[in-house]
């Protein structure tokens, strides 16, 4: 491997090197302080809406001690080649092909969000090629609510309802209830919303293919055996802390840490807290016992992490109505209400349609929702947050009661 030297953040926007393996083109940039570095490289694999430039600060930080490779597989990042026939496992195998073609030593992947599934599969399927593994925003998509929302996002794209798709996706990535803790600015949210609203036809197709891979993924048959570090944002409601902890518990040699005041974007919101953990991890040094801005979870307690991301409380006004274009209006009692979902009770017909539902509550706009589980006269649901005004109103409605309950 011949590494580029003289790194500067602006160079992440320059054309990548391209490796062809069979019909597939793999885009990469390889950086080091030494052009002929033989040390194990850190391999960066990003999420759905990230590019090489998203990792400018991390590359600068890591280059002090490691060579760094940024890799875009087909359909990822800036690689526009579509690969609908490749599942997650086949994409992960391309990482092994990449390492073999360039005669790389065992890699140290960093997998973020969508990239976490690829990195973890690479580590589990090719253990001899993986020295260490760092994951954040672990996407296994076994949780019914997450799957329902992802399916709905695909339907919205198919129907060209980009504004609603963008609003729902933004609410998944950024926790609106915790903005004062995560520090996400209105300007950042607006910029991300515009990016989502303006996806080109090719970008939408890539999103569709990547999302379908996640939904089609049957789960891990075996887990990484190399030293593994899993970082979870404490307010991540998209890929929740208990899911990170459960994944870490299934790995042979995993540590799991909760990043304070972070959500699904914790690795960008709380760079210092994350760095103080991954720096020693990649150097095979002991992790700090009491890291600043993070909490390490005891391995014996990984399967005991709280599964509910927010308190669901009984509203002061419990009477509500479910509306559906075909079934009309149905009276319900709201037993639990949160920002992300609710639990209702009422005389509901069996086999409810998947789409087209709204909940009417006194003092709130109509709330779009997806039914999740129906058991007798009880219904659990998730809110889709496709309407910004309704989402904001619901957040303002539930926040005081949730803060009081947590006090």
Residue ranges of predicted features:
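Conserved alpha/beta-hydrolase catalytic His-Asp/Glu region
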Residues: 144-146, 164-222
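Short strand-loop-strand
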Residues: 313, 317-351, 356-358, 375-380
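Catalytic histidine-centered segment of alpha/beta-hydrolase-like enzymes
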Residues: 262-275
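Short beta-strand/loop motif that positions the catalytic acidic residue
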Residues: 224, 230-232
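Active-site loop/oxyanion-hole signature of alpha/beta-hydrolase fold enzymes
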Residues: 69-110
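Flexible "cap/lid" loop of the alpha/beta hydrolase fold
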Residues: 124, 131-160
């Amino acid at each position: 491997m011949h590494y580029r030297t003289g790194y500067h953040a602006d160079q992440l926007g320059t054309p990548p090197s391209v490796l062809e393996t069979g019909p597939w083109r793999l885009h990469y940039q390889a950086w080091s302080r030494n052009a002929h570095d033989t040390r194990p490289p850190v391999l960066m694999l990003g999420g759905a809406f990230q590019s090489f430039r998203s990792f400018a600060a991390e590359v600068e930080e890591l280059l002090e001690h490691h060579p760094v490779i940024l890799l875009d597989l087909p359909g990822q990042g800036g690689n526009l080649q579509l690969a609908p026939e490749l599942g997650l496992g086949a994409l992960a195998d391309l990482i092994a092909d990449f390492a073999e073609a360039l005669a790389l030593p065992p890699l140290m992947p960093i997998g973020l969000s969508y990239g976490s599934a690829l990195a973890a599969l690479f580590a589990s399927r090719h253990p001899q090629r993986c020295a260490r593994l760092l994951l954040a925003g672990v996407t296994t998509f076994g949780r019914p609510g997450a799957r329902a929302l992802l399916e709905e996002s695909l339907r919205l794209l198919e129907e060209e309802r980009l504004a609603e798709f963008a609003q729902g996706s933004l609410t998944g990535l950024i926790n609106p209830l915790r903005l004062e803790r995560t520090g996400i600015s209105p300007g950042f949210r607006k910029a991300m919303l515009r990016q989502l609203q303006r996806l080109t036809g090719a970008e939408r197709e890539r999103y569709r293919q990547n999302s379908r891979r996640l939904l089609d993924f049957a789960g891990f048959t075996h887990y990484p055996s190399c030293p593994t570090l899993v970082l979870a944002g404490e307010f991540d409601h998209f890929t929740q802390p208990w899911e990170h902890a459960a994944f870490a518990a299934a790995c042979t040699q995993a540590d799991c840490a909760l990043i304070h005041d972070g959500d699904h974007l914790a690795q960008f919101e709380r760079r210092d807290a994350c760095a103080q953990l991954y720096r020693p991890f990649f150097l095979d040094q002991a992790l700090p016992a009491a890291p600043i801005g993070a909490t390490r979870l005891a391995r014996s307690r990984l399967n005991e992490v709280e599964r509910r991301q927010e308190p669901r409380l009984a509203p002061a006004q419990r009477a509500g109505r479910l509306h559906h274009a075909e079934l009309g209006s149905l009276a319900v009692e709201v037993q639990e209400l949160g920002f992300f979902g609710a639990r209702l009770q009422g005389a509901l017909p069996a086999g409810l349609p998947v789409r087209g539902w709204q909940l009417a509550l006194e003092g709130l706009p109509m709330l779009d929702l997806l039914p999740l589980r129906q058991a007798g006269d009880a219904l659990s649901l998730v809110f889709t947050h496709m309407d910004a005004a309704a989402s904001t109103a619901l957040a303002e409605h539930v926040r005081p009661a949730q803060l009081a309950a947590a006090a």
